[in-house]
């Protein structure tokens, strides 16, 4: 479903940071300021968000993987929830350096986590001593928190969706190094450089974060649904062609 200007206003997408903290590279997206707070121009944000959704829709239709990244307290739960709804991987605890540029190491940790989860399911942990079980529980909890969201990613994603580029500059840098497209929310205190699909907007409000994440997840689900419909229609077309020539 398309996001409207009214929804953006209600979510506070237009509220930037204090004027003294601004990044001049965001000047083209700033409408003005009120009470020493920059006001983002939603007439710029809305079409740019729509473009980002269009790209995401196409990527999802081609079975692409989009990694959701949002580790700030106010975005953690929403990022996990919307990524899961869209069937996409996510990082919502801490970005571990090398998550993309050193994917081989991440794969080792993922294997360890999956082996541990399998041990729990098979009842293997019941044979452990109290101390062993406690250490096991601590390790599996730590792994689930840090990499649980990417355990089924399978490889480097086709794009990343980031809320707050300043807070996640390592993730953006890694994506840039690998040529992975970056879709990101950029507030008035950060630079849009290194971002392929810039969404100028408030990156602190939980309502605004929910609007972005839901919009991206919706676009993914729409892209997948469109791809399925095309396959069904193509199959029907083939059947009709066979009938005509029978």
From Swiss-Prot:
Alphabetical list of PROSITE patterns matching this protein: RIBOSOMAL_S2_1
GO biological process: translation
Domain of life: Bacteria
Any one cellular-component term (Gene Ontology): cytosolic small ribosomal subunit
Gene Ontology molecular functions: structural constituent of ribosome
Keywords: Ribonucleoprotein, Ribosomal protein
Family indicated by similarity: Belongs to the universal ribosomal protein uS2 family.
Protein name: Small ribosomal subunit protein uS2
């Amino acid at each position: 479903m398309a996001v409207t200007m009214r929804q953006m206003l209600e979510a506070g997408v237009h509220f930037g940071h204090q004027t003294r903290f601004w990044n001049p590279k965001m000047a083209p997206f700033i409408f003005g300021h009120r009470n020493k707070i920059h006001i983002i121009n939603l007439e710029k944000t809305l079409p740019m968000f729509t473009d980002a959704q269009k790209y995401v829709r196409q990527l999802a239709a081609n079975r692409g993987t989009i990694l959701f990244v949002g580790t700030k307290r106010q975005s953690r739960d929403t990022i996990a929830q919307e990524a899961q709804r869209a069937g996409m991987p996510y990082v919502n605890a801490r970005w571990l350096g090398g998550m993309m540029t050193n994917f081989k190491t991440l794969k080792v940790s993922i294997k360890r986590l999956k082996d541990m989860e399998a041990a729990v399911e098979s009842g293997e942990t019941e044979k452990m001593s109290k101390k062993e079980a406690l250490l096991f529980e601590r390790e599996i909890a730590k792994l689930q928190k840090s990499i649980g969201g990417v355990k089924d990613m399978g490889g480097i994603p086709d794009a990343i969706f980031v809320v707050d580029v300043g807070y996640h500059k390592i993730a953006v840098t890694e994506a840039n190094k690998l040529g992975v497209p970056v879709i990101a929310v950029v507030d008035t205190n950060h630079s849009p450089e290194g971002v392929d699909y810039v969404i100028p907007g408030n990156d602190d409000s939980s309502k605004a974060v929910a609007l972005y994440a839901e919009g991206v997840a919706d676009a993914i689900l729409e892209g997948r649904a469109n791809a399925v419909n095309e396959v069904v229609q193509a199959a029907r077309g083939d059947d009709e062609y066979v009938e005509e020539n029978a």
